[in-house]
């Protein structure tokens, strides 16, 4: 879907009309749905998980996609190391948890974020690893957990293409893409490859 005149940073969602059935999933035009291909998401400050499953209009309490730039990040100045598998040593880490602790090499304002991982790259490099594997880094609902617990690990993502807002410095929904790109570029500059953990069944 392309809408002429929509600018960078504009928020949007979908309403889908069709038959409504009490027997199970169907169309529900009172619901604003997130674009499954969204590259950025806004509305975390007003999002209410319960409104997504109620019969009421959720437009005031839903997540919305954000129009992002269409250009691709130029990694030509930050080439991937391309090590052979037999030479690869992977360090799996949680994008938020790794740098959140006060003993982390991350600066205080970057703790728990993609930028905090950049601060920690000299330490990671000193371990002799050749790659990092990020546990799920895409947008997920922290409330998607039983008994009032938190979804800390990031599985069951809401959007496969938008970075998780909790790993981003600042409130700008467009900053997530840039900060994740900065992390990947910095890893390459430190001789480290980057793998992203994705699990499609949960």
Give the predicted meaning of each segment.
Residues 96, 137-139, 199-201:
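Active-site beta-loop-alpha junctions enriched in small/polar residues
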Residues 89-91, 132-134, 194-196:
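Hydrophobic faces of well-ordered beta-strands that scaffold small-molecule active sites
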Residues 124-145, 149:
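Carboxylate/His-rich catalytic cores and anion/metal-binding grooves
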Residues 104-113, 144-189:
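Aromatic- and acidic-residue-enriched carbohydrate-binding clefts of CAZyme catalytic domains
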Residues 1-3:
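Ligand-binding face of N-terminal immunoglobulin V-set domains in extracellular IgSF glycoproteins
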Residues 96-132:
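A conserved hydrophobic secondary-structure block that centers on an alpha-helix together
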Residues 5-92, 99-109:
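The feature marks proteins involved in alpha-glucan
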Residues 77-82, 119-128, 184-188:
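Short amphipathic alpha-helices and their capping/turn segments at secondary-structure boundaries
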């Amino acid at each position: 879907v392309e809408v002429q005149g929509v600018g960078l940073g504009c928020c949007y969602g979908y309403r889908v009309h069709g038959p409504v059935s009490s027997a199970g999933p169907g169309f529900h035009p009172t619901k604003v749905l997130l674009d499954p291909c969204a590259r950025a998401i806004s509305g975390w400050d007003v999002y209410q998980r319960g409104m997504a499953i109620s019969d009421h209009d959720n437009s005031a309490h839903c997540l919305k996609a954000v129009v992002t730039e269409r250009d691709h990040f130029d990694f030509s100045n930050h080439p991937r190391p391309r090590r052979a598998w037999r030479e690869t040593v992977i360090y799996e880490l949680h994008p938020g948890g790794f740098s959140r602790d006060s003993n982390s090499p991350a600066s205080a304002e970057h703790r728990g974020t993609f930028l905090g991982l950049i601060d920690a790259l000299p330490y990671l490099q000193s371990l002799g690893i050749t790659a990092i594997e990020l546990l799920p880094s895409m947008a997920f609902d922290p409330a998607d957990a039983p008994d009032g617990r938190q979804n800390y690990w990031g599985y069951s993502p809401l959007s496969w293409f938008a970075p998780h807002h909790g790993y981003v410095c600042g409130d700008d929904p467009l900053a997530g893409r840039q900060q994740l790109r900065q992390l990947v570029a910095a890893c390459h500059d430190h001789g480290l490859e980057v793998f992203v953990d994705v699990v499609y069944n949960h």
